[in-house]
Each structure stands twice: as structure tokens, then as C-alpha cells.
UniProtKB/Swiss-Prot annotation:
Residue ranges, compositional bias (Low complexity): 19-28
Amino acid composition bias (Acidic residues), ranges on this chain: 74-84, 93-108
Species of provenance: Homo sapiens (Human)
Its biological purpose: Required for pre-mRNA splicing as component of the spliceosome. Core component of the splicing-dependent multiprotein exon junction complex (EJC) deposited at splice junctions on mRNAs. The EJC is a dynamic structure consisting of core proteins and several peripheral nuclear and cytoplasmic associated factors that join the complex only transiently either during EJC assembly or during subsequent mRNA metabolism.
Protein known as: Protein CASC3
Gene for this chain: CASC3
Motif Nuclear localization signal 2 boundaries: 254-262
InterPro entries linked: Btz_dom, CASC3
Coiled coil: 95-131
Phosphothreonine found at: 357
SMART domains associated with the record: Btz
Length: 703
């Protein structure tokens, strides 16, 4: 570049000499003033070269420039404006040539030609002058430069450009083009004090204008004294559409969609069941005097009512245990009276028990039958069904024995039970024997939580029933109830526990069991009932090939037997072929319909998730449909397929009330009767005591 420039400079000098007349015509004064002025108007003169026709004009300009450089005229220009000399040169230069190097400068401004500009700076000012004198033709050979006069040329004085380029070398962190550049200005960095050398001085002069307006910025959130007082009711209503503060006053509260009960209840449930429950319970108390009203009340009040109400309800309604509404067709209303969840549990259990009890003993349990009636009526179409309202309370009362805690637990379990227990479809009325068919109606299995409570509730009702069902009693000794008492039994509604005929006995037993366990808390019941060996799950579900002593089970107990001969009315054989769901094995299986509706209780579905009753057949929760709970639970048995009763040895009386077959525990009600064992002593209030391991154990563990 330097060589080229020198050549150009020499050529220019020659041109100047040869065209001295031209330069003279410009006149040195002109050159000084006029030429300077021309350079000053660089933009306009920039277009001159092309207009002037090329070289002559260019030469003239160049002469002016070069002459100025060498003569006083140039010094005049520079002296006028220290920047102007260079500016003139650069302007003319770019103006002269279509591709003046000044283009480079302007580009450099765009940060394109920094290196070039540095190289140019390296060249002496004389070189620059020479550059200014470059011939247009030589320059025109340069390609890629902007055409002069296209408006892109730099308007900035060269001096400034040069100063920017060369003299000032920016640090990496200050050079915007360098990735290491650290911004030190701008809103985001106004508090960044890292490189604060001149920062504070520089900032103020730069920009004083605000980029945004703060005026109304916090209007929406300003503290206003007049807004600090509580709003009036009118204001609240205007704001929210209702008075958000009046939670006690339902009418004032914003109308909301009525939520389903947490556990969902069968649709049949009476929408007003909540209100009804109380009425019914009172009614039952009155009607079923036998049942202690307090039991029902306690259960309900404490939420323990689940048992009482649920029994009746579940029986009749087969409500889903956990559901707020009870299945019971009638139960809807009946159950309604009880507390929602507890009632449900209780309803299902109680209804089963009551139904059984009622069916067995309609007179004392007219109310109970009513409880069971929805399903009872369907299954047995028992007169007791007529007393649906009255019936539910009695079962609830039986709950009284249950402790509140038990009721509460039961309730809690209800949700599980609902999931686990399937309702057993009510058998046809014909299926159920003369005894109230409440059992027949499959009570939906009570939720696991509810099973115990229902038994208790049944207990009160059962007591009545038992009194009336002395017959049943014969089979079931009070002792039986005790074995039944174990929460399994308790948990099972009587109706479930007992077969259609046997249910009365079963009720009796249950009663007894309840009495035994009545005082017991749910927790104690949850413990393995004292009665005999803890049964595996209370699946007393009828196991194939297992025989249940009729005495033991009031309801038909199925057992797989070789001979199909039916057992005594109270005893029932379950065919192996029968689909009695094993409570543990087949959670939601529904048993096949019994061949003898009268003989066999309606199928009971057992929810597998329910805790198995520990002692008796009757699981606290409803056993799987196949499970027999005390007598004829409502388990359906395959009709006509009664296997011959298994040998009695299966259930030796001497043996503990429970035997386990195939993972199912079967209890011999008769034996259990004999064993009036009350439920195990109540557990201490704290369900589990956690003690630190003895030091030895600890040391072992550590070692």
C-alpha cells in the first residue's frame, strides 16, 4: 500500500506540475479558502468528480489538496480547522475516486476496516497526503470500495476516525467487538461497580433521559388509608358477587355445586340422607328399642355411627360403604339419617346384619328389616322391609359397643372398603329363605374400615334379633359371638355372617361377639381377636372343599365336599366349582347365585383389601363373596352345586374356631360359641409403643 501510495503521490506531483496553470487558476487564496470550503462541503463536492468528468476535476481537486499540503494554502485549511485539512483530503479523496480509500475509512467506521485503517495510520501523514493525491485512475482500479457520492461515505472528519482507530487501543473488556467486552453502562449495569474507574463520571453526561415512566407504576398497589377498613357487606357483594365473610350463613355463601361425598355413594342414596339419618336413627331407637339408641347416636355423633347405620344401610342399600350415599335402595333414605361415611360403613354392615337379623327376627327388628329392606325387599321382599326408616337405627345402636375410635377407624377404612368391597347384587327375593333376606340382598361389602363397626351396630340390633332369634341362638352360643367378636366377626354385618336361616343365630352370635367386643375398641378388634388362632384373612370366604358346620355358620356355608348333599339348613357347602371369591384371592369376585335362595344367603362380595377378620368367619370387613361369615353370610353359592359337606373333622369343635384352608381362615361358629372368649383385652390407647432396642440389640446392630 505504501508503495502504491508513493507512486500515486509522485504521479500526482507530476500532474500538479504539468497542470500548474490549473492549480494557479484555483489561485492560492482560492485554494486555501475556496478549496477548503470545497472540502468542507465534501458531500457536495463528492459528487463533483463524476460530474466534472473524471480526471480533470479530480486532478484539480488533487492539486488543490496536494498544493495545500505543500503550500501555505493547505496549512491555511488545516489551521482553519485542525480537522479540516484531513477532512478535506479524505472528502476530496473519496469524492474524487469512485473507490476512494476514504471508503475504507467510512467502512472502518463500521468496524470493517480496522486493520486497514491501522495500516494507513502507520503510514506517515505525508503518506496520507500522498494518498490524497492518488490519481483517480489508479484508484479506480481498486475494487470493492464504495462509489463516492453514494451517501455512504463517512461524514466524520478523518482525524476523528483516525483517532478512534489507531491512537485509542481499547482493552479487550472495553472493545464491544471483543467477546470479552464487559458492558459498563446501561440500565442493567447501573449498580455494577466492578470497573468503576471513570464510570461515574462518564455516565451522567451520556444520557439523562429516562427510558420509562415511573409515575403510575405502583398505583395498583399503593397504600390507601381509605381502603384499610373492612369492606361493607354491600361492597363485598359488589366485588365478589356474594358475601365472602359469611361462612356460617349458608344462604349468604356463594352457591356452589354440591360436592359428592368423598367416598361416592350409590345413586339410590336419598339426597337428604343426612337429614334422614338422624330421624331414622331416632325412629330406630324408638322402634328397635332393643337396640340401644345411644349406640347409634354415639356412632353417628362420633362418626362411629358408621357401623350402626351402615349395617342397615349397607344391607338394604348395599351402599358402597365409603360412599356418602348408601346403596340401599330404601337405604338411601334410611342411611341418610346417619352420618354420611359412618353411616355408610355401618349401613353396609349393619344392613347386612340387620337384614339378617331382621329377616330372622322381623318383629324386634322391624326397623332392622327396613334397613335391609332395599335389598331385602329386592331379595326376600321381606315385610321387615316396610320399616326401612326404623330399621337402620337399630343396627346403628348396636354399634354403641364399638368405641368411637373404632367407629372412626371404620369410617376411615370405608374408603378402602368401598374400593375393595364389591357390592353383592341382591339375590332374587326367592333366593332368600324365610328368615329375613336382608342377607340375601348382597350388602355391598362394608368398607374395610367399617366391617367391625357394623358388627357392633348389629350387635345391638342383633341382641334384639337374637332375643327373637333364639332359634339361631341355639345354634350359636353366646360363646360363639365371642369368637365372632373378633373384629372379623364384628366387622361382618350379621346378615353377611349368617345365612338366611342361620342369620338369626348369627345375629345372636354376632350379638354375643359384639357384646364381648362391644366394649372393645376398634383397635383391639383390629388386633387378632382373642378368639382362636388368628385366622388368615377373614376370608372365611368359603373355600372349596371346606365344610362349614351349619351350627357354626348359620348361613349356608359352602365347603367343597364330595357329595353335593346340602348341609343342614344352617350349614352350607360351598362347591369347589362355586365361584365364591376368596376374600384374599379374588377381591371383587361375586359368588354365583345360591341354588337355594332360601338356603343360602345372597352372595356377598368381599373386598379383598379389607382386613381379614382375625377370628371368625365374618371378616370385620366384608369377606370376599365366597367368604362365609358366620352362618350364612350373604355369600352367593353356586346354585345347586353344594358339594358334600366336608367331614366335620375339618372343623373340630375342639379346635380353635378358625381353621385356615388354602389361605382362607374358616371359623366354626359352634365352637366359637363355646368359646365365649371376649375380644382380647383392650389395647392401651396407644396402638403401637415404640421402644428403643435394648442395648445388646443396639450393639449388635451397630456391630
Amino acid at each position: 500500500m505504501a508503495d502504491r501510495r508513493r507512486q500515486r503521490a509522485s504521479q500526482d506531483t507530476e500532474d500538479e506540475e504539468s497542470g500548474a496553470s490549473g492549480s494557479d487558476s484555483g489561485g492560492s487564496p482560492l485554494r486555501g479558502g475556496g478549496s477548503c470550503s470545497g472540502s468542507a462541503g465534501g458531500g457536495g463536492s463528492g459528487s463533483l468528480p463524476s460530474q466534472r468528468g473524471g480526471r480533470t476535476g479530480a486532478l484539480h481537486l488533487r492539486r488543490v489538496e496536494s498544493g495545500g499540503a505543500k503550500s501555505a494554502e493547505e496549512s491555511e485549511c488545516e489551521s482553519e480547522d485542525g480537522i479540516e485539512g484531513d477532512a478535506v483530503l479524505s472528502d476530496y479523496e473519496s469524492a474524487e475516486d469512485s473507490e476512494g480509500e476514504e471508503g475504507e475509512y467510512s467502512e472502518e467506521e463500521n468496524s470493517k476496516v480496522e486493520l486497514k485503517s491501522e495500516a494507513n495510520d502507520a503510514v506517515n501523514s505525508s503518506t496520507k497526503e500522498e494518498k490524497g493525491e492518488e490519481k483517480p485512475d489508479t484508484k479506480s482500479t481498486v475494487t470493492g470500495e464504495r462509489q463516492s457520492g453514494d451517501g455512504q461515505e463517512s461524514t466524520e472528519p478523518v482525524e476523528n476516525k483516525v483517532g478512534k482507530k489507531g491512537p485509542k487501543h481499547l482493552d479487550d473488556d472495553e472493545d464491544r467487538k471483543n467477546p470479552a467486552y464487559i458492558p459498563r453502562k446501561g440500565l442493567f449495569f447501573e449498580h455494577d461497580l466492578r470497573g468503576q474507574t471513570q464510570e461515574e463520571e462518564v455516565r451522567p453526561k451520556g444520557r439523562q433521559r429516562k427510558l420509562w415512566k415511573d409515575e403510575g407504576r405502583w398505583e395498583h398497589d399503593k397504600f390507601r388509608e381509605d381502603e384499610q377498613a373492612p369492606k361493607s357487606r354491600q361492597e363485598l357483594i359488589a366485588l365478589y358477587g356474594y358475601d365472602i365473610r359469611s361462612a356460617h350463613n349458608p344462604d349468604d355463601i356463594k352457591p356452589r355445586r354440591i360436592r359428592k361425598p368423598r367416598y361416592g355413594s350409590p345413586p339410590q342414596r336419598d339426597p337428604n340422607w343426612n337429614g334422614e339419618r338422624l330421624n331414622k336413627s331416632h325412629r330406630h331407637q324408638g322402634l328397635g328399642g332393643t337396640l340401644p339408641p345411644r349406640t347409634f347416636i354415639n356412632r353417628n355423633a362420633a362418626g362411629t355411627g358408621r357401623m350402626s347405620a351402615p349395617r342397615n344401610y349397607s344391607r338394604s342399600g348395599g351402599f358402597k360403604e365409603g360412599r356418602a350415599g348408601f346403596r340401599p335402595v330404601e337405604a338411601g333414605g334410611q342411611h341418610g339419617g346417619r352420618s354420611g361415611e359412618t353411616v355408610k360403613h355401618e349401613i353396609s354392615y349393619r344392613s347386612r346384619r340387620l337384614e339378617q337379623t331382621s329377616v330372622r327376627d322381623p318383629s324386634p327388628e322391624a326397623d332392622a328389616p327396613v334397613l335391609g329392606s332395599p335389598e331385602k325387599e329386592e331379595a326376600a321382599s321381606e315385610p321387615p322391609a316396610a320399616a326401612p326408616d326404623a330399621a337402620p337405627p337399630p343396627p346403628d345402636r348396636p354399634i354403641e359397643k364399638k368405641s368411637y375410635s373404632r367407629a372412626r377407624r371404620t369410617r376411615t377404612k370405608v374408603g378402602d372398603a368401598v374400593k375393595l368391597a364389591e357390592e353383592v347384587p341382591p339375590p332374587p327375593e326367592g333366593l332368600i329363605p324365610a328368615p329375613p333376606v336382608p342377607e340375601t340382598t348382597p350388602t355391598p361389602p362394608t368398607k374395610t374400615g367399617t366391617w367391625e363397626a357394623p358388627v357392633d351396630s348389629s350387635t345391638s340390633g342383633l341382641e334384639q334379633d337374637v332375643a327373637q332369634l333364639n332359634i339361631a341362638e341355639q345354634n350359636w352360643s353366646p360363646g360363639q359371638p365371642s369368637f365372632l367378636q373378633p373384629r372379623e366377626l364384628r366387622g361382618m354385618p350379621n346378615h353377611i355372617h349368617m345365612g338366611a336361616g342361620p342369620p338369626p343365630q348369627f345375629n345372636r352370635m354376632e350379638e354375643m361377639g359384639v357384646q364381648g367386643g362391644r366394649a372393645k375398641r376398634y383397635s383391639s378388634q383390629r388386633q387378632r381377636p382373642v378368639p382362636e388362632p388368628p385366622a388368615p384373612p377373614v376370608h372365611i370366604s368359603i373355600m372349596e372343599g371346606h365344610y362349614y358346620d351349619p351350627l357354626q355358620f348359620q348361613g349356608p356355608i359352602y365347603t367343597h365336599g364330595d357329595s353335593p348333599a346340602p348341609l343342614p339348613p344352617q350349614g352350607m357347602l360351598v362347591q369347589p366349582g362355586m365361584n365364591l371369591p376368596h376374600p384374599g384371592l379374588h377381591p371383587h369376585q361375586t359368588p354365583a347365585p345360591l341354588p337355594n335362595p332360601g338356603l343360602y344367603p345372597p352372595p356377598v362380595s368381599m373386598s379383598p383389601g379389607q382386613p381379614p377378620p382375625q377370628q371368625l368367619l365374618a371378616p370385620t370387613y366384608f369377606s370376599a363373596p365366597g367368604v362365609m361369615n358366620f352362618g350364612n353370610p350373604s355369600y352367593p353359592y353356586a346354585p345347586g352345586a353344594l358339594p358334600p359337606p366336608p367331614p366335620p373333622h375339618l372343623y373340630p369343635n375342639t379346635q380353635a374356631p378358625s381353621q385356615v384352608y388354602g389361605g382362607v381362615t374358616y371359623y366354626n361358629p359352634a365352637q366359637q360359641q363355646v368359646q365365649p372368649k371376649p375380644s382380647p383385652p383392650r389395647r392401651t390407647p396407644q396402638p403401637v409403643t415404640i421402644k428403643p432396642p435394648p442395648p445388646e440389640v443396639v450393639s449388635r446392630g451397630s456391630s
